[in-house]
Amino acid sequence: MQDAAPRLTFTLRDEERLMMKIGVFVPIGNNGWLISTHAPQYMPTFELNKAIVQKAEHYHFDFALSMIKLRGFGGKTEFWDHNLESFTLMAGLAAVTSRIQIYATAATLTLPPAIVARMAATIDSISGGRFGVNLVTGWQKPEYEQMGIWPGDDYFSRRYDYLTEYVQVLRDLWGSGKSDFKGDFFTMDDCRVSPQPSVPMKVICAGQSDAGMAFSARYADFNFCFGKGVNTPTAFAPTAARMKQAAEQTGRDVGSYVLFMVIADETDDAARAKWEHYKAGADEEALSWLTEQSQKDTRSDTDTNVRQMADPTSAVNINMGTLVGSYASVARMLDEVASVPGAEGVLLTFDDFLSGIENFGERIQPLMQCRAHLPALTQEVA
């Protein structure tokens, strides 16, 4: 592998188009996103996530997102068996940050929409208008079955009908403070929420299937998708094109934000050695659990998030796109991501979050043309 990567050159018009948002996918579950005995082993804590998000804010990251996970994969690493809760975590992080956008994830089978509307309005107040909600339908049956709230396997084929009603109730309550919505899943009777958010509440999703993208095209402000492969930064382009086409049919602009893991070092070879080490320690027992759960949904197409997560190609980090290389190589590849039509941002994970974000801010981001608009750093990280 080459140590240094050539910089891409863009015209001014291209640079304007390629101003890309950067977010951090905070490790709300143990061990982050590496299912490996060779990866850093750690528990999720508020203090860890506080340090991560404050460091990300210092380096001008645009947003931070936490997932929700209610049951893990087990194995030697007890992968994702230990998780914080998304809304309460992000409420705490909203109180200790000042600029970065904050997103929590609602597991919509567990929380009535009127409660989510009120919690979101509360965190909007805490954050000064920096909060938004990521809506997920739920795919891992044991998460909900353990609590007695799994609605039955026909939910796999009706989940976006459910989510459509859910978001309509949210929009009613955030918009006017009142909802009388009547549907198959929800019935509101003069339901009230006040105070309302100080700014329009952003809703984000991660639809990969046709049904998921159609939902995002109608209701989401942007849509997450998986990057694909190792050091193939534009391989997600067909997914972004599908999202762009779906949004055009609704007359809305819904950009794609792409999930990548960054494994960087001084040289390409050093970064590659870390990646190979993580793969060699893959927790096969935990990965078997993931594969088993991905096969439970027999009613959805093969393009769903969980099917990609369980693909054996790079299951050690749930098959998110992986950028492995020197700081210059990673910067070049992220500029390539920004060149894909419809790609408006990336959501990043790291093998080691604290050092990864610092290296990104100090060594990678300054080389990225799609981040050249940022001001110079003027203060130390707390």
UniProtKB/Swiss-Prot annotation:
Reactions the enzyme catalyzes: uracil + FMNH2 + NADH + O2 = (Z)-3-ureidoacrylate + FMN + NAD(+) + H2O + H(+); thymine + FMNH2 + NADH + O2 = (Z)-2-methylureidoacrylate + FMN + NAD(+) + H2O + H(+)
Entry GO MF terms: alkanesulfonate monooxygenase activity; uracil oxygenase activity
Keyword Iron-sulfur: no
EC number annotated for this UniProt entry: 1.14.99.46
Lineage top rank: taxon: Bacteria
Induction comment: Up-regulated by the nitrogen regulatory protein C (NtrC also called GlnG) and repressed by RutR.
InterPro entries, per database record: Luciferase-like_dom, Luciferase-like_sf, Pyrimidine_monooxygenase_RutA, SsuD_RutA_monooxygenase
Phosphoprotein keyword on record: no
Enzyme class: oxidoreductase
Residues the record lists as binding FMN: 68-69, 134, 143, 159-160, 209
Pfam family for this entry, one: Bac_luciferase
UniProt record, GO biological process: alkanesulfonate catabolic process; nitrogen utilization; uracil catabolic process
Keywords: Flavoprotein, FMN, Monooxygenase, NADP, Oxidoreductase
Membership in a protein family: Belongs to the NtaA/SnaA/DszA monooxygenase family. RutA subfamily.
Role played: The FMN-N(5)-oxide reacts spontaneously with NADH to produce FMN. Requires the flavin reductase RutF to regenerate FMN in vivo.
Entry protein name: Pyrimidine monooxygenase RutA
Phylogenetic lineage: Bacteria, Pseudomonadati, Pseudomonadota, Gammaproteobacteria, Enterobacterales
